[in-house]
Regions:
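Conserved G1/Walker A P-loop phosphate-binding module
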Residues: 1-111, 139-140, 145
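C-terminal-of-GTPase-core extension/linker across diverse P-loop GTPases
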Residues: 2-6, 17, 146-353, 360, ...
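Flexible interhelical turns and helix-capping residues at alpha-helix boundaries
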Residues: 9, 131-134, 194
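Short, intrinsically disordered, mixed-charge
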Residues: 22, 54, 90, 94, ...
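Glycine-rich, flexible loop/turn motifs
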Residues: 23-31, 38-40, 48-51, 80, ...
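Amphipathic alpha-helical transducer elements in NTP-driven molecular machines
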Residues: 32, 46-49, 62-68, 82-96, ...
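Conserved Switch II/interswitch segment of TRAFAC-class P-loop GTPases
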Residues: 40-45, 72-82, 93-155, 168-182, ...
Length: 366
């Protein structure tokens, strides 16, 4: 899974990225401090895999991961080549979802590219650039199929869809709020356009430390972000990127104490990773043994053979059965053999839909 962190210059975007990855990406108080997208791999917090490791006395514990990409600050006119231009819109097109950092804090020491704090304006600036870029994609598709569509019913049907999506965007709406017709062709075509505004989006409302305890409830800027997100089908997440950067330098005990002092239960980064999983409809299944305990990321609804293929493609091709036990049941019984004796380990076939927290031992023949 790859998430792109976007936002106007100086909203705290690279600070958030630094917190997530501890990568120390260049963060400076001027536009375009991020010239190339910085990429960082982040472990998905999952206590289950740690406890499994303890149960099995395993040599290695491997959590699932998310790839975060810090994409250079966009400005008005990016879709026409202003600032760092279309190069960075192309970088966003490669991600699975967008984390859009919006500045909701006042600080005279950190300049704003437009001179004042106005989240609604900032969101509209970025969204318009994404919309313009998407319209350009659709215009190219229209130009390619318009003539042939006069004699081809399938292309005529697609042309109708493309023009409807374009009209939706021209009305200032995001593609993710467009109701795609419920037929296979339309679904495939729409997905194939890979529109930026169709990507799942989380708005990260970057607040001052004082706004963390009440989750931004008393911050009018956050209220505006929430209002806009509701209209366009996006999620909202309140975070203080500066605090998160400080937390990233602490060990677990110090971090817990610091969070308690702030009146916050858990770090924003843990919540952001969890929210990203939820947004994309992802779950984790687990594999366990003395050599390694590992979490694997799959889409909700994935069947056992395809889950096996995440480990190794041969496993999917040669899939026979999957021995499955719920994580908590395994932990409560102390071992797989004890769980087998209790009759709570299932032997599942190719139609079994994997659940979050399943501990699976695959049987295969290749």
């Amino acid at each position: 899974m790859k998430l792109g962190i976007v936002g106007l210059p100086n909203v705290g975007k690279s600070t958030l990225f630094n917190s997530l990855t501890k990568a120390g990406a260049l963060s400076a108080n001027y536009p375009f401090a991020t010239i190339d997208p910085n990429v960082g791999i982040v472990s998905v917090p999952d206590e289950r895999i740690v406890k499994l490791g303890e149960l099995y006395h395993t040599k290695k514990v491997t959590p699932a991961t998310i790839e975060f990409v810090d994409i250079a600050g966009l400005v008005k006119g990016a879709s026409k080549g202003e600032g760092l231009g279309n190069q960075f819109l192309a970088n966003i097109r490669e991600v699975d979802a967008i984390v859009h950092v919006v500045r909701c804090f006042e600080d005279t020491n950190i300049i704003h590219v437009d001179g004042s704090i106005d989240p609604a304006r900032d969101i509209e600036t970025i969204n318009l650039e994404l919309i313009f870029s998407d319209i350009e994609i659709l215009d190219r598709r229209i130009a390619k199929i318009a003539k042939q569509a006069r004699m081809d019913k399938t292309l005529a049907k697609e042309l109708e869809l493309v023009e409807a999506v374009k009209k939706h965007l021209e009305d200032g709406k995001m593609a993710r709020t467009f109701e795609v017709p419920d037929d296979d062709d339309a679904q495939i075509w729409f997905k194939g356009y890979n529109l930026l505004t169709a990507k799942p989006t989380i708005y990260a409302a970057n607040v001052a430390e004082d706004d963390l305890a009440d989750d931004g409830a008393s911050n009018p800027h956050v209220a505006k972000v929430r209002e806009m997100a509701k209209e366009e089908g996006a999620e909202v997440f309140v975070i203080c990127a500066q605090i998160e950067q400080e937390l990233a330098e602490l060990d677990e005990d110090e971090k817990k104490e610091y969070l308690e002092d702030l009146g916050v239960e858990s770090s924003g980064l843990d919540k952001l990773v969890a929210a990203s999983y939820s947004l994309l409809g992802l779950i984790s299944f687990l594999t366990a043994g003395e050599d390694e305990c590992r979490a694997w990321t799959i889409k909700k609804g994935t069947k056992a053979p395809q889950a096996a293929g995440k480990i190794q493609t041969d496993f999917e091709r040669g899939f026979i059965k999957a021995e499955v036990v719920n994580y908590q049941d395994l932990l409560d019984n102390g071992s797989l053999s004890a769980a087998r004796e209790k009759g709570i380990v299932g032997m599942e076939g190719k139609d079994y839909v994997v659940k979050d927290g399943d501990v699976i031992l695959f049987r295969f023949n290749v």
